[in-house]
Each structure stands twice: as structure tokens, then as C-alpha cells.
From Swiss-Prot:
Record-annotated membrane-spanning stretches: none
Keyword Nucleotide-binding: yes
Name recorded for this polypeptide: Nucleotide-binding protein Pnap_1080
GO CC list: cytosol
Top-rank taxon, per record: Bacteria
Cited NCBIfam families: PRK05412.1
Pfam families associated with the record: DUF520
GO molecular function terms listed in the Swiss-Prot or TrEMBL record: nucleotide binding
Classification lineage: Bacteria, Pseudomonadati, Pseudomonadota, Betaproteobacteria, Burkholderiales
Known function: Nucleotide-binding protein.
Keywords: Nucleotide-binding
Length: 163
């Protein structure tokens, strides 16, 4: 029975390089000299921590990061941007999570989308992915097209296509 997996995975190496390039640019830019501006990646937690002297500076760092990620070929929709919080004195911090794997709510949304369109395929939620199975390859390709058209806020990809 033909099947494919709908996944949400990012290339952490490219994200790490983009964060390192962001930190390098922060160090060389004149408007960040003598400030607490920094960017670092915690690979275990898949978090990017931005530190700055104020909300405006955090936004500037975020713009640099988005630019570097785009140049590296990483979709910025992988970023789950957190709130800006004060960490003492005039400094502020923002934690941005790097999405990896489809969350349960999003997987249920994909599953309901497929069931709601009464397609001849079944969607099963597995750890961090949604497996779609069907009798015909054409049905699976129609399901892929439907998912791409309806779900715009996630950079989903399809892999493990079996015939």
C-alpha cells in the first residue's frame, strides 16, 4: 500500500551557521559596539537566545538572524518566536525555538483536513510526523497538493514515499 510521511524538520547545521554568522556580524557592527547584544544557539534545547539592551536592539538582531537564515536556505517559518523579557538592568532576552517535528495539535489539523475532504487516504499521527497511506499513488499526490495548499504557516516537507 503506497504511503508517505509529512514531516517538519530543519537542518540544524545551517541554523547553527546562521546564528554564528549573526553573532559575528553583531561583533563587527558599529551600532552594537559596547552593548550586550548577542546571539547563541542551544542545540540540545533547539533554542536561539537573543540578548540586547532593548526591544529595538532585539528586533535588529532578529532581522540580521532572519537575513542569515534566508541566505542559508532555511525557511524562517521554522522559528517560533518567544516574548521579549527583562533579565536585569536594561538588558532584555528573547528565546526563539527552532521547530522540529510536527506538534500534536498541528498533526491533528492535518489529519482533520484529509478526513474532511473525504479523500481515499488515511492519515495516522506518529511521533513528530503524519503518515498518509492510500490505495493509489494518485490519491497520495492529491493529498500532498491539498496539504501544501491549505497549510501555509508550516514549512512541511514530504519524505519516505513508498509505492
Amino acid at each position: 500500500m503506497p504511503s508517505f510521511d509529512t514531516v517538519l524538520e530543519t537542518d540544524l547545521v545551517k541554523v547553527k551557521n546562521a546564528v554564528e554568522n549573526t553573532a559575528k556580524e553583531i561583533g563587527t557592527r558599529f551600532d552594537f559596539k559596547g552593548t550586550a547584544a548577542s546571539a547563541e544557539l542551544k542545540e540540545k534545547d533547539k533554542e536561539i537566545i537573543l540578548i540586547g539592551d532593548g526591544d529595538f536592539q532585539i528586533e535588529q538582531i532578529h532581522d540580521i538572524l532572519r537575513n542569515k537564515l534566508t541566505k542559508a536556505g532555511v525557511d524562517v517559518r521554522f522559528l517560533d518566536i518567544g516574548k521579549v523579557e527583562k533579565i536585569g538592568g536594561d538588558k532584555v532576552k528573547q528565546i526563539t525555538k527552532v521547530r522540529d517535528g510536527i506538534e500534536t495539535e498541528e498533526a491533528k489539523k492535518i489529519q482533520q483536513l484529509i478526513k474532511g475532504n473525504k479523500m481515499k487516504v488515511q492519515a495516522a499521527i506518529q511521533e513528530g510526523k503524519v503518515r498518509v497511506t492510500g490505495a493509489k499513488r494518485d490519491d497520495l499526490q492529491a493529498a500532498m497538493a491539498l496539504i501544501r495548499a491549505e497549510i501555509k504557516d508550516l514549512p512541511l516537507s514530504f519524505d519516505n514515499f513508498r509505492d
